[in-house]
UniProtKB/Swiss-Prot annotation:
One of its GO terms (molecular function) is 3-(3-hydroxyphenyl)propionate hydroxylase activity. The keyword Kinase does not apply. Transmembrane segments: none annotated. The gene is mhpA. Its EC number is 1.14.13.127. One of its GO terms (biological process) is 3-phenylpropionate catabolic process. Catalyzes the insertion of one atom of molecular oxygen into position 2 of the phenyl ring of 3-(3-hydroxyphenyl)propionate (3-HPP) and hydroxycinnamic acid (3HCI). The keyword NAD applies. Keywords: Aromatic hydrocarbons catabolism, FAD, Flavoprotein, NAD, Oxidoreductase. SUPFAM superfamilies: FAD/NAD(P)-binding domain (SSF51905). This is 3-(3-hydroxy-phenyl)propionate/3-hydroxycinnamic acid hydroxylase. It catalyses: 3-(3-hydroxyphenyl)propanoate + NADH + O2 + H(+) = 3-(2,3-dihydroxyphenyl)propanoate + NAD(+) + H2O; (2E)-3-(3-hydroxyphenyl)prop-2-enoate + NADH + O2 + H(+) = (2E)-3-(2,3-dihydroxyphenyl)prop-2-enoate + NAD(+) + H2O. It comes from Burkholderia cenocepacia (strain HI2424).
Amino acid sequence: MKANNRNRTSVAIVGAGPNGAAMANLLGLYGVDTIVVERAPQIVEFPRAVGIDDEALRLFQTAGLADELSRDIIQNVPLRMFKANGECFADIRPSIREFGWWRRNIFMQHLAERTLRDALARYPHVSLRTGEEVVGLEQDDECVTLQVRAADGQQYELDADYVVAADGGRSPVREMLGIRLAGTTHPMKWVVVDVKNARLDQPCTALNCDPRRPNVCIYLPFNYRRWEFLVFPHEDEEAIAQPESIRALIAPYVDDVDRIEIVRARTYTHHSRVAERFVAGRVALIGDAAHLSPPWIGQGLNAGLRDVGNLAWKLAGVVNGTLHRRVISTYESERRDHAKAMIDLADTFGAMLMPTSRLVAFLRDRFLGLARYAPGLKDYVLQMRFKPMPSYTHGVVVTGTSDAVGRMIVQPDVETADGARRKLDDVLGPWFAIIGWRCDPQACLSDDDRAFWTALGAKFVQIVRSRSGTCREQRIASAHDSVCVEDVDNAMAEWFDRHAAPLVVVRPDRYVAAQTDAAGMAGVTAAFQAFAARQRETADVC
């Protein structure tokens, strides 16, 4: 294929929703030329995602946007479950912040999208084209050519080294690739309503598990509130979305239903589906284009952001010539099984929490009632330990070195040598890092191995016990440029007590790629050289 320089980029992203815009921000951070093509001329404001978790906020922290996004987020929102008689039978409010952020947070998708899109202005090498639609796709071993219809109806070709399809559950790109979205579509529909000025002092997400009309009530930012009501098969979905019907549904939960302002309403069908492939040649699917989940554990968007975190650095490394092209294929092997596991969990929760069977509701209430008296089970539920965490045994990991490998590393606060308190990721930087627990990681490397990690762009960080004085001494005496920080909350000490080896290779997505001691670093480095591009000039370009 011949490249047209006027319409050519390293990565083309199809779709500028939260996943596509997040991907563009990370690629911008990594210096990758990126063009985002979005069909809609404006941000869509009908009811969509509202839940964002600690892993997602950690990703936005890497992108330099967590604080700005947090201005529109209610953090640490509990999840409460109510019986048909109004009794609360479960109050889920996770207190742990192992990744540096609260586990349950509420936002409004259109506000986040605006922040993410505005942030792209930071990067002159990233452009957003709205009102443009991808209508065709061809690819070969060298690049991908997209046929794009512009807002004026004219078509042009856009050549890219790689394409990321973030174009939603009905993904045209997925259809063009002939990839099947396997799974089920649930027969029941739900009417989703966003309202304003509802007089309801209930600062939580409430699951009203009444088999007569299961529904969800969500406390949203800026005096908004969302209700989601089950629509029964005999009911007309258009009629139930009318204002008078909506007020009748909400009336049992508020004092003055006529006072509320109905902002928007839409009927949804839930899906439990996973694409048979996440990667096809030089095209990768992310978010709803790759998997669709019911909303019961609030992980639909968060699963998409895990895709973003996993794929962005791999694309950047390949395009920038530091990583071998084969690492892109590890995106599917690392992400697909976990995405499916989250969907299965959502299906289970939906069946348990929102049954229309009175018998199932009774058995659920009995089980959760008994769980209160079993401390281990109670903690498992209330701290959301039921959420399966990704654990990679294949991909960009060196297995066999530690049970921490393939899992996300914790993120406590640490203190720098000048006394500043910072989150660990802000010290590690947005790329690879090698952590040394109570040792300088560079001192544990041979000259050749140090040169390899330096060429890869890794940052070297030494973490020491709080108030040990080591950071000050190391800053004065070290022969290397490793950063030294103190473990002020003793969190890293606890982590290394569980995972004893003192050297950890951390990937840009904060997953542990390897853990070993000084004697094992040569082997880890050799294993990583298989993931690296043999020469910078071997980077694949159109």
